[in-house]
Amino acid sequence: MLKQSCRVPFNPQSDQEYSNLKGDNMMRAMKQLGMTAAIIGAMSAAPVLAQEIPADASNFYKSESVTVRQVTFPNQYNMNIAGNLFLPKNLDQKTKHAAIIVGHPMGAVKEQSANLYAVKMAEQGFVTLSVDLAFWGGSEGQPRNAVSPDLYAETFSAAADFLGTNPLVDRERIGVIGICGSGSFAISAAKIDPRLKAIATISMYDMGAANRNGLRHGMTLEQRKQILREAAEQRYAEFTGGETRYTSGTVHELTETSTPIEREFYAFYRTPRGEFTPEGSSPQLTTHPTFTSNVKFMNFYPFSDIET
């Protein structure tokens, strides 16, 4: 089945994707939130080679000019969502500021790339909030690692609830940076939540199309139906006490036959460069969604009726 984890920012093997991040999509969205031309220019420097990547592009980078606070807040279904709130240390406390919600790659958690984007945007003067999608990381939801596109989208609306009631935030200038799968979840949220004024995506995956069609549209109709049949049967097994089955995600070891994309994901998610195991989880489960819930992506169409 299709790998659910996505390419991550500042990947030495993905200079082109790093370049794409700074294109018109990001610029238009951030301009709507009030980003100055100078800041956009700083974000638009030419991509660097792997050996030239600075320390402040490291996944676990911490900024001396930004404070971070762990927060929780309820979504519309009274599930607690975990986040990190980033504030510039020189933030003017007497005025309201633009805010950005940052969503992590599918199968990851906020500590894997979302925090980095949040802290870098806070350095530019934004109030930023990285979040764990429902069922992942520090956010509530059972079973762990479950797939629910609707609740993933709701995470961004819940974050808007939290930010829009913060006295430091201008609720008319709340935007989202969605990384990988969160790009499609943020778009899904914005279709029905006009409070999300600007959306920027990084290496976005349409998780619906990806699961229906596979890489390069390589999945046949019969293969898709077989996955649905297997998931349906697995539900019976788990309902009667069987073990939860997990799927896709990042491989745990490389072999001579490992594909380039498996190697790229492994280089981030399974090495000190990006590996992170949330409290209560295990390294063997990170990045792996539950098999029976993963098929819900096949009924996920984030771009349908996008004109709303």
Where do the language-model regions lie?
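N-terminal cap/lid segment of alpha/beta-hydrolase-fold proteins
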Residues: 53-95
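Short beta-strand element of the alpha/beta-hydrolase
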Residues: 95-105
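The serine-hydrolase catalytic nucleophile loop
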Residues: 107-119, 133
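Conserved alpha/beta-hydrolase
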Residues: 121-138
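Alpha/beta-hydrolase active-site loop
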Residues: 146-167
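Alpha/beta-hydrolase fold nucleophile elbow
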Residues: 168-180
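Alpha/beta-hydrolase-fold enzymes
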Residues: 187-272
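Conserved serine/cysteine hydrolase catalytic core
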Residues: 296-308
